[in-house]
Amino acid sequence: MTGTTTEPAWAKLNLSLDVLGARSDGFHDLRMVMQSVDLHDDVTVTLDDTGVCRAETNRSYLPCGADNVAVRAAQVFLSRAGLTCGVHIRLHKRIPVCAGLGGGSSDAAAVLRALERLTGAGFTRTQLEEMGAQVGSDVPYCVAGGTMLAEGRGERLTPVTPMPRMPVVICKPDFPISTPELFHRVDARTSRCRPDTEGICAALADGDMPRLARRMYNVFEDVLTHREGEIAAIKSRLLDGGALGAVMSGTGSAVFGIFADADSAAYAKRRLARDYAECFLTETIGRLEI
């Protein structure tokens, strides 16, 4: 079995993110509204007769073996399909790593879509999402993306009113934030503020993007330390540049702002790009039909 195809792997944003509590399996129950944007990696998948799944990437510091989630996704797919062919994955990365933008998860989801196209195995979107859940918590969402309410550890997906196409500026400071450490900090708090998830869904239903932007909220921002104070500074600069709202995505360290018009977004991006190498002007996109 041979063949090659290329799939885009879109970044995801968390319009809201709530941690409901720790689970007995080591994960946490989450509730979040997620949104895809056009910033993407390119994932080229080639079938061959080597019997080996491996990857290569334009980022030398990323793993290319079984530690790479895209490779794990290929292994899960082949096992489920009963196939023994080899898979070569070429990842052209644009999405920042350690940013809370789901780059690895989206790459894994793109591999699942590509393998379904190449093999014609006949898996449904739901089955691809189930495979994705074996690889990572965000992978099921990334299979089709769009505007979704995600619950459980991220695998329970409910469609909400799609967000219209809007300009977005993403800025990642030059430091990572430890995901396990953030969860530990949240778990240690006896009380916490909660995002208005219902309010965000209602704003989407009403098409009221300023109201949605004002309600964007990420509980992880409450447990950032002074060392991570640059997150708040970037948010302020986005808001000063005209963003309707700004918030950290996932466990960071990327921050994004939603804008009403492209000119304001471009201006804000230019200002931030003077100080940050990883700064992107992109836009929201809809859900894939699979």
Residue ranges and their predicted role:
Residues 1-99, 117-126, 163, 170-175:
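ATP-binding N-lobe of GHMP and related small-molecule kinases
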Residues 15, 43-45, 70, 104, ...:
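Residue-level signal for inorganic ion chemistry
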Residues 32-34, 129, 139, 155-161:
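A generic local secondary-structure boundary/capping motif
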Residues 49-63, 111, 206-216:
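Short, basic/glycine-rich phosphate-binding loops at helix/coil junctions
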Residues 86, 108, 112-149:
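Contiguous, small/hydrophobic- and glycine-enriched helical/loop subdomains that border
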Residues 144, 149-245, 260-290:
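Conserved, helical-rich catalytic subdomain that frames metal- and/or nucleotide-binding sites
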